[in-house]
Amino acid sequence: MLPSDLVNYKKKSRKIIALTAWDSISGSIAEQANVDLVLVGDSLAMVCLGYQSTLPITLENIIYHTNAVSRGFKKKIEEQPLVVSDMPFMTYQCGEDKAVEYAGKIIQSTYAKAVKVEGAEPEIQKVISRLIRMGIPVMGHIGLTPQSYLNIGLRKQGESLASQEKIKKEASILEELGCFSIVLEHIPDLLAKEIQNSLTIPTIGIGAGNYCDGQVRVTADLLGLNDDQPPFCQPIIQGKKLFKDKLKEWVDSERLS
C-alpha cells in the first residue's frame, strides 16, 4: 500500500479505514482486521506511556514504536497496510532543515511510507512543501490539533463562521502543497462534508462525521481501554473492564488451586 493508493480509493469512492497501533501486537491485529492504514500516532504517549498529553513523545519514541508495529505484520509487503508515523511535537516546528532531517530519519529507519504533520500555519506550510519536495509524503491534520492544546484546548473546532472559513482555507492549501490526504479532527459534520466535496485528495475523519472519505480511530479508545473516552468515539467493547474481570478470575482461581 502506497500513499497514492488512498487517492485512488477516493476516486473509486472506496471508504478508507485506519487505526492506530503502538507495538507488534496492535500492529498485527490491525493488519488482520484488514485496515487500509496504520497510524503510529503520538497518542501512544497517553495510551502506552502514561503521559497526560501527546507533547512528551520524542522522535526516538516514534521510530521505536513504528518499527515494533511493522514487525507485527505478516502479510506480503504489497498487501500490508500503509504505515504513517506522526511527526512529534517540535520536530517540525523548529524549521525546515530540522524537519527534513527528522522526517528523513523516520522514513529511513522504519517501514513508514509517510509522515503526518499537524496544522497549516504559514511556517508549517513551508515545512510541508519542503518535505514533499524532498520526496517524503505528508498527511495533513487540521481542525483539532492535539499538539496545540496548550493554546486552543481540546474543544471542538469549526463552530464559528470564521473558524469554518479558516479550516476550509487550510484544507485547500494543504492539497495545493501536495499532501496526499488530510485528517479532519473534531469538526462539524457538514463542514467536513463541504471540505470532502471540495478536494481531490481523501479526508480521514475522527470526530468529523460520516461524510469523510475515511475514518481513523485510536484503537485503545475503540476497544474501551481508557478511563477517559473522547466524546466522538463510542467504544465497541468495554475492553478494560473485560480484561480486568477475566484476569481477576484467573488470579482468584490460581490462589484457590
Swiss-Prot record:
For molecular function, the Gene Ontology terms on record are: 3-methyl-2-oxobutanoate hydroxymethyltransferase activity; magnesium ion binding
Residues that span the membrane, as ranges? none
Q: What does the entry comment about cofactor binding?
A: Binds 1 Mg(2+) ion per subunit.
Tell me its cofactors.
Mg(2+)
One annotated Gene Ontology cellular component of this protein: cytoplasm
Checking CDD domains in the record gives: KPHMT-like
Localization, UniProt: Cytoplasm
Q: Which UniProt keywords apply?
A: Cytoplasm, Magnesium, Metal-binding, Pantothenate biosynthesis, Transferase
**Chief site of localization:** cytoplasm
Describe the function of this protein. Answer: Catalyzes the reversible reaction in which hydroxymethyl group from 5,10-methylenetetrahydrofolate is transferred onto alpha-ketoisovalerate to form ketopantoate.
Q: What is this protein called?
A: 3-methyl-2-oxobutanoate hydroxymethyltransferase
Q: Which organism is it from?
A: Prochlorococcus marinus (strain MIT 9301)
Lineage, opening ranks: Bacteria, Bacillati, Cyanobacteriota, Cyanophyceae, Synechococcales
